[in-house]
Amino acid sequence: MSRSAPRIKNRAPAPIQISAEQLLREAQERQEAPASAPVQKIEDYEELEEYRGRRRSEFEDRLRRNGLNMSTWIKYASWEASQGEMDRCRSIYERALDVEPHHLPLWLRYTEQELKMRNVQHARNLYDRAVSILPRIDQLWYKYVHLEELLGNIPGTRQVFERWMKWEPEEKAWHAYINLEVRYDELDRASAIWERCVTCHPVPKQWIRWAKFEEDRGNLEKARIVFQMALDYIGEDEDAMEKAQSVFTAFAKMETRLKEYERARVIYKYALERLPRSKSEGIYSSYTRFEKQFGTMNSVEDTVIGKRRIQYEEELAAQEAGGAPADYDTWFDYSRLEEDAYRALLATGGSQDQLQQAVKRVREVYERAIAQVPSSQEKRDWRRYIFLWLRYALFEEIDTRDYDRTREIYKAAIALVPHRRFTFAKLWVQYARFEVRRLELTAARKILGAAIGMAPKLKLFSSYIELEVSLKEFDRARKIYEKALEWDPTNSQTWVRFAELEKNLFDTDRARALFELGVGQAEGGEASGGLDMPEIVWKAYIDFEFEEREWEKVDALYERLLAKSGHVKVWISYALSKINRATAIEEDEDEEDDDHDHDDDMAATPSRELTEEEEALRQQRRSALASSAREIFQRAYDNLKSRSLKDERVALLESWKSFEQQHGSAETLSRVEAKFPRVVKKRRQVEDSADGAMEEYYDLIFPDDQDEGKGAFKLLQMAHAWRAAQAAKEQQQQQQQSSSAETGASASAGAGATGDDVRDEESIGIAIDDDQEQDASGEEA
């Protein structure tokens, strides 16, 4: 008996088809409804007491089973509080604290419950007990001092802070204590606390904040003493000074604010002399800024800037003399130099006259630069020129804040561009965004509308839509999308974004209608212009229906797309969507379970495990969808085979194999692997070759292609055998005729032949017999 799988002669579909929908419907019908708890209605006091007793028994049973679960204690106590039984509530909390006194949420819920019931003294006592047991938990201390301050007990608040400070807490705790004293104008107390704080946390940031505190309260000598204490603590160790560079910088800046420039210079030099240049970048940069403002560094900086100005002027003069087109890179560098000089002067606190002169120089450079209008009408020559206008407008808006001048710059740039030949969307968009920043929304809309009417571009539509969506003007955004589609209905991105807008607005009908219009545009072909990238619209449409869990529509879309293109990637995506459908359904079920099981105590509530029935249902669903995916893979394979697309068949088999490795069995995987082709080397004639040259090439031979070709191969083999037999028969007849002629000639030679002649005749006869035997053997063959 043959062990091979039986050959299927009838490949027609079965008369009764079982679909995945029927399987799911039958499983749903057989599923039993979950049992629901009956609704209780309390009619009188006795029923209420019975209900309370039953609930208490339930809680006590839970605690007996697991008394270490603090969430059960908290729920029990909260329930007693909701019943108005505060004594029982306190008793439960105290029992819980006996079990686990170091559980922070227990203390917090206990104190919150007391404060909710306006039992302030109880809350105080609880906080006192809590900070005694958990002194390292800052949250308890913060709540304790906040309660005391709310009650107006400032001395009590100080006592709590003093108890807290004995534990040397973090810096924020010390700052909270200091802020308390500052709020009640106890600055001397705050200064004393600062001294204790830097003793506990002697880091540079604390020294600086203490000195700033003393400076703000007007005690400048105390501020200097603080910095001197900090420098004494730091010492002259190189590593310590490197970490404390901010202390030296803050000390010098304070002296600068007090106009003690020599003191500040001495501090900078003291630090720079003791630190190498590689480790003193921060101090050196501060010292450079200081000298620029108050020392001789200003003249040095002015000299450097002056030399660079002369260099740029010489380059520009050489370009004008040579008649070469304008080099906008030089103008960019020149304008950047003047802008940096203005910003440096502004940062160092230059006088008003100096700032005005710097602004005047920047404007002069920009005006000279934008006067170099390109002579050609090619967009590539205008691109960098337009960026000069944009930088000029940004300088006026951000640095000088001359908004009227900024608006005039944008208008002049737009008037200069030949919009009939080309336009710059960035220029229009930046102008509109400027008006938005000035809260001139109407002007921004007019600008973008004029841009679209004068020279429509996709970026202009996108920016206009982005503006309206950010302003929540969705109706306006819809109108702009409609205008964009009227202008260019072949743009796939516009269709997709329009539909995504409707989807985000939860208008699925409009989104689906837009996708249908986009697909219809793609299916229209040359008559309607088609789409530049129709696959984007199809993919977005399918993903949309998949997210909406419209499985029938997903299948219908795939079938439509396959009827149109039949690409192997579409087949693969169609097949994999079946198994992805099972994952999506399971995720939806898990989300529904999470919504039902949601509770305030997220950490204490374990995730729900699936029952055996639910697990079996999911497994059954996955198996059904996996079978559907296999059917699609088989359809795809047959389709590609009929179209003789070998490379696409290999790609399909690779995806099919990966699918079976994840979701199939060893049997299904072996079936797919058996379909893989083998590579063979063949020869063929070179195209357009006059001498009939041959070339070798590699071809893919599929097993099922070989099986179908076996019948034709046998017929051809029989034809070759018949032809060979006919040729052998003709050759035998010719040999027989020649041998009979030779025999007659030897007989007429005479009877008086000698014995030698007889021997020769016998040898001839033997040779003839050998020839006859050879012919017979050839005929049989």
Curated annotation (Swiss-Prot):
Instruction: Spell out the Gene3D superfamilies in the cross-references.
Output: Tetratricopeptide repeat domain
Q: Which protein are we looking at?
A: Pre-mRNA-splicing factor CLF1
Give residue spans, biased composition: Acidic residues. 586-602, 768-781
Q: Mind listing the UniProt keywords for this protein, alphabetically?
A: mRNA processing, mRNA splicing, Nucleus, Repeat, Spliceosome
Q: Where does the record place the region Disordered? A: 586-621, 724-781
Does Nucleus appear among the keywords? yes
Q: Which family does it belong to?
A: Belongs to the crooked-neck family.
Q: Tell me, which GO biological process terms does this entry list?
A: mRNA splicing, via spliceosome; spliceosomal complex assembly
- Describe, as the record does, how this protein assembles with itself and its partners: Associated with the spliceosome.
Composition-biased stretches (Low complexity): 724-755
This entry carries the following GO cellular component terms, namely:
post-mRNA release spliceosomal complex; Prp19 complex; U2-type catalytic step 2 spliceosome
Describe where the HAT repeats fall, as residue ranges on this chain: 50-82, 84-116, 118-150, 152-183, 185-216, 218-257, 259-293, 308-340, 357-391, 401-437, 439-470, 472-504, 506-547, 549-580, 628-665
Fetch the InterPro entries from UniProt.
HAT, HAT_Syf1-like_N, HAT_Syf1_CNRKL1_C, Syf1-like, TPR-like_helical_dom_sf, TPR_rpt
| Pfam family of the protein (one) | HAT_Syf1_CNRKL1_N
Q: What does this protein do?
A: Involved in pre-mRNA splicing and cell cycle progression. Required for the spliceosome assembly and initiation of the DNA replication.
List where in the cell it is found: Nucleus
**Which superkingdom?**
Eukaryota
Whether Transmembrane helix counts among this entry's keywords is no
